[in-house]
Every structure is written in C-alpha cells, then in structure tokens.
Amino acid sequence: MYAKIIQGIQDDVELREELQKIFESKSHKAMVKYSLLLGRHIMDLTNTQPCGEISEAYEISEKWLEGKAKFTEARAAAIKIHRLAHNEEDPVMEKVYRIMVQVAATPHVKNHALIASDYAIKLINTMYPDNAQEVSRERQEQIKLMKSL
C-alpha cells in the first residue's frame, strides 16, 4: 500500500507502490547502500558537487556499513545538512539538501531511504513542473537502483 510520506508531490502512484514493495524486502544495510546511490544520482542529475557536510555524511555511512560508526554519528551529520537546507534560497538546491538529509539519516532509520526517494520526486516536480514523464523516469531509476542491491 502506498504510504504517502511527503505531502504535495505529483507522483506515479503505481511506481511508488512498486518501490515500496521492493523496499520492504530489503535489509537496513541494503537501504543505506541504496541511499548513497540515490544521493549520487541526484547530485549527477543536478550537477551538484558534494559540500563538506555531504562528504562527511557519505564517509559516516560507509563506516556504518563496515560497523565502524554509530547511527548517532549519521544523525548528527544529517542535522548539519538540515541546517544547509533550512538556509538555502534556491528551490532546487534546497530539495537536494533535503534529499541528502534523508540519505545521511538512513543508518539511523531504514525508512529514511524511502523518504529520500519521495524528496527526489519533489525535486523532479520543482525542476520539471507538471511533467508526469519525468516523475515516472525518476521512479524507474529508483526502482532500478533499489533492485540492484
């Protein structure tokens, strides 16, 4: 069942439900790996270079996957990126930061991976208003990334 996490997004409900079914079959570690892949995809899509806070979050997530970092470190990294999002005036970059907050927080709670996916759709809605084809393309990419793990 489609659990709407982010309000006010124009989504492809069928593809979102498919993504959620795949999500439910995956481990917490797999979803951390997915979040990192999704974040890289979003940075490529928006031609964004990772700032120090995002790089730190990626390092912590990689260490968490190796059992060398605690989820509290990931949560602290997410809070740093949240501050960037809160102060960002450019609507595209604000969404990129919101996605990265969720990517950074995924070692803390698995569901943050799904929230990052929904924020990515909100980003697509901002970049391509009223464009169902771009939304579907993004959901298909998310499904592909998630299935790869």
Where are these regions (language model features)?
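Structured binding/interaction patches within domain cores
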Residues: M1-R139, K147-L149
